[in-house]
């Protein structure tokens, strides 16, 4: 699984002109799933996300987690995170999992992340054409890949 985490002041996702989810301070997370991804990958990411200390403490030091600030999370599926651009100029998405594999794992990830956060999270709609708006705070943007845990 590959994710892009952005620390935001607020974020929302709109589908066909209707706001599906909106959050205030917290994380906007893009998630891409490939065929080899498992629930163990999702569990590892959930633990990392809720404990990631990238919010300022009283001294202006990034020392607080999303749990510490009672922040919110918006998750949006993003198969293009697995784009291959090795040959030519048109990306290939051959590494992105097909919906029959990706949807159950995406739903599992969202459920487990909500459990880890201790409250509901906002989500997009898998496979939909979405408009995502956010105000990146910092900016703070972090990429994680369960196949390359650095």
Segments predicted by a language model, with ranges:
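Short hinge/gating elements
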Residues: 88-96
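A short acidic, glycine-rich active-site loop
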Residues: 96-104
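N-terminal, polar/charged subdomain of small-to-medium soluble alpha/beta proteins
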Residues: 1-89, 103-150
